[in-house]
Regions:
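Active-site-proximal acidic secondary-structure segment that organizes catalysis
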Residues: 85-88
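Metal-dependent nuclease catalytic regions and adjoining charged, substrate-binding loops involved
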Residues: 37-43, 48, 80, 90-170
Length: 170
């Protein structure tokens, strides 16, 4: 989209999705680097006071609506992280004050799947409460150097922490 060219032949399976995005009205920003301060104010990605950073693969801003797309190369959308969509939407709301609705998507270009989410500026405070609560728990763990083990689907075969009680290779 950035260069206005067709995809190389080996990626032709994703050309339809790219054409659809390219046809949308609005200002298209590719690999947009966005930052937020600890007060959740917009700032530059490399600013000294940056607290949160995100890079959005594609943002299309058209008046009060923005489309946000993150391209994924995974073979399955089964474990897609919709939280990434929420954080991208919150960051776009901060940087583009006229935007009232963000239509976000994780576009899995290999398996041709798409995971969508729609977010409204009116829901900002609820979403920020969720994410700031998660951050507070991580900050507390870092401050106290206490990292309680939690089981996940990766423990059995993929965890590198052999001393963890949940590691399946013990």
């Amino acid at each position: 989209i950035r260069d206005g060219k067709d995809l190389p032949a080996k990626y032709s399976y994703a050309q339809g999705a790219m054409d659809s995005l390219n046809a949308k009205q609005g200002r298209k920003l590719c690999e947009e680097k966005l930052g937020l301060t600890a007060d959740l104010e917009p700032c530059g990605f490399f600013d000294d006071n940056v607290w949160f950073r995100g890079i959005v693969d594609l943002v299309i801003v058209d008046d009060d609506v923005a489309w946000v797309v993150d391209y994924k190369t995974g073979k399955s959308a089964k474990y897609a992280d919709k939280g990434q969509l929420e954080l991208m939407a919150l960051t776009v709301f901060a940087h583009f004050p006229n935007v009232q609705t963000v239509k976000a998507a994780l576009l899995f270009v290999v398996c041709t799947a798409i995971v969508k989410g729609t977010y409204h500026r009116a829901s900002n405070s609820t979403l920020w409460e969720k994410w700031l609560s998660k951050y507070a728990k991580m900050q507390s763990a870092a401050d106290n150097d206490v990292w309680n083990p939690r089981t996940s689907g990766l423990c059995r075969r993929h965890c590198a922490v052999l001393e963890c009680v949940h590691n399946g290779r013990n």
